[in-house]
From Swiss-Prot:
Residues found modified as Phosphothreonine: T53
Start-end of Basic and acidic residues biased regions: 1-14
A UniProt-annotated Pfam family: SASRP1
Gene behind this protein: Spats1
Protein name: Spermatogenesis-associated serine-rich protein 1
Keyword Transferase: no
Modified residues (Phosphoserine): S71, S74, S77, S78, S79, S91
Keywords assigned: Phosphoprotein
Sequence ranges of Polar residues compositional bias: 21-37, 54-65
Region (Disordered): 1-92
Biased composition (Low complexity): 66-85
InterPro entries tied to this protein: SASRP1
């Protein structure tokens, strides 16, 4: 009986020791969780091989990322200008595409900064002070090889007035008025011509009046409406003109003289020629 009691007492003690070891292991696990806060971590016995858990892998990755971020921050703080210049170069490469010069050769030939002799710029630059945009002036220099070509008219020039009308006759833009001065053209600039002031005024003078204007003082105030000026039709005027011509022909008959006879005139002229020849001989 005593031996059976001792066996039961030893079994109870063993069970209590297992429970105590289990509670201590649970407390150790809770302490490790509260201290790390990353995940589950199991402490195995020294004799058994260690098994990696998800918490270990996450902590390793966190250490790697922290080290890389610290290195990148130090490198960025050491060279901010190089990174900004690289980004600017990339943006320029993306935003400014290359222009094919072979596709549009005539446009590139016009934008020459200098002439063939390389002495003066061919295009003028006028900045717009009213805005922030600086653009090139429309057109080239006014003088080409020392010659102003703004007041020269080309032979191949055709205006709208010339293209209208009949084929045989051209429409005269001046309506028959001759040129009085060399610069009498609206599309030319005579002030740029050489010695333009010696030719006189650029505009034609007013010459449609024969004499100077004389101012007349008209103080007549009619008390009743004046009679209208008679305006006869054309057939009445033509009939009156024919009547005047007939009256004049009849009046000229009073001064009529008979013509000289033909034979008498012929003989008289022949005698005159014979006498002149005899005198010469």
């Amino acid at each position: 009986m005593e031996a059976a009691r001792d066996a039961q007492h030893s079994d109870v003690l063993e069970s209590k020791g297992c429970l105590a070891s289990r509670t201590s292991s649970h407390q150790n696990r809770r302490a490790s969780l509260s201290s790390d806060g990353t995940g589950l971590r199991v402490t195995d016995a020294p004799g058994l091989p260690r098994v990696m858990t998800p918490s270990d892998t996450a902590s390793g990755l966190g250490q790697k990322t922290s080290s890389t971020s610290s290195s990148s921050s130090s490198s960025s703080s050491s060279s901010p200008s190089s990174s900004s210049s690289a980004q600017a170069n990339r943006s320029l490469k993306v935003s400014l595409p290359e222009i094919q010069k072979e596709k549009y050769p005539e446009e590139f030939s016009l934008l020459k900064s200098q002439t063939t002799d390389g002495q003066r710029p061919e295009w003028t630059f006028y900045p717009r002070f009213s805005s922030n945009i600086h653009t090139y002036h429309v057109g080239k220099q006014c003088f080409f090889n020392g010659v102003f070509r703004g007041n020269r008219k080309s032979v191949a020039e055709r205006t709208v007035d010339k293209s209208l009308g009949k084929k045989k006759y051209d429409i005269d833009p001046r309506n028959g008025i001759p040129k009085l001065t060399p610069g009498d053209n609206p599309y030319m600039f005579p002030e740029q011509s050489k010695e333009f002031f010696k030719a006189g005024a650029t505009l034609p003078p007013v010459n449609f009046s024969l004499g100077p204007y004389e101012k007349k003082f008209d103080t007549f105030i009619p008390l009743e409406p004046l009679p209208q000026i008679p305006n006869l039709p054309f057939w009445e005027k033509e009939k009156a003109n024919n009547l005047k011509n007939e009256i004049k022909e009849v009046e000229d008959l009073d001064n009529w003289q008979a013509p000289m006879p033909f034979l008498h005139g012929f003989l008289s002229t022949a005698n005159r020629t014979i006498t002149t020849c005899d005198q010469k001989v």
